C-alpha cells in the first residue's frame, strides 16, 4: 500500500517514531510493530498463502494468511481487517488474540531482516478469497492439524515467523481452540 509506515519501538517496546515501510526493511531493520493473522473458514480450515515473488523479504515463501503493520492511531483489529481486505480481498469476523507477546528477528536469504514485536491473531473469513497478485501468488485451505504437522516436519518450507508462532505451545493450543469453536 502506498504510503504505509511502520511504528518504530524503543528498548521498552514503546513507540519511538515512524519510518516508511520499505525504507524500514533493510539489512539492519529497526525494531518495529507488526501483526500476524491466521485465517479460517467456517469448517475450521486454515488459509495458508504463498508470498508474491515481488515481495522484498521471503518472496515466494508459504506463510500464514496475512501479516502487516498497524498504522498510527489504528488498533490491531483495524489493521488486521485492513490488510485482509488489501492482500486477500476478504471480510473477516471473530478476531481473537492467539499470541499477544510474540516477537522475533529473522534474516531472509537476501539479507533483509525482520525485527518485530508481532502479536498473533486468528479470525474467520466470511467472504470469498480474491487475492491481490502483488501480495499473494497462491493459497490453499488446509486442515490445521495437517498444517501444524507440515511446519514441524519441514520448517524450511515456510516463513520463519509462521514456524516460530506454531512452535509456541500456548499459541498452538489457542489456534486449536479457535478451530474447535468454529466447528461447534
Curated annotation (Swiss-Prot):
Binds 1 Mg(2+) ion per subunit. The magnesium ion binds only when substrate is bound. SUPFAM superfamilies: Nudix. It comes from the Bacteria. Mn(2+) binds at residues 25, 32, 69, 114, 116. Belongs to the IPP isomerase type 1 family. This is Isopentenyl-diphosphate Delta-isomerase. Homodimer. It is found in: Cytoplasm. It is an enzyme of class 5 (isomerase). It comes from Klebsiella pneumoniae (strain 342). The keyword Metal-binding applies. Pathway: Isoprenoid biosynthesis; dimethylallyl diphosphate biosynthesis; dimethylallyl diphosphate from isopentenyl diphosphate: step 1/1. The active site is at 67, 116. Its EC number is 5.3.3.2. Catalyzes the 1,3-allylic rearrangement of the homoallylic substrate isopentenyl (IPP) to its highly electrophilic allylic isomer, dimethylallyl diphosphate (DMAPP). Its cofactor is Mg(2+); Mn(2+). Residues 30-164 form the Nudix hydrolase domain. It catalyses: isopentenyl diphosphate = dimethylallyl diphosphate.
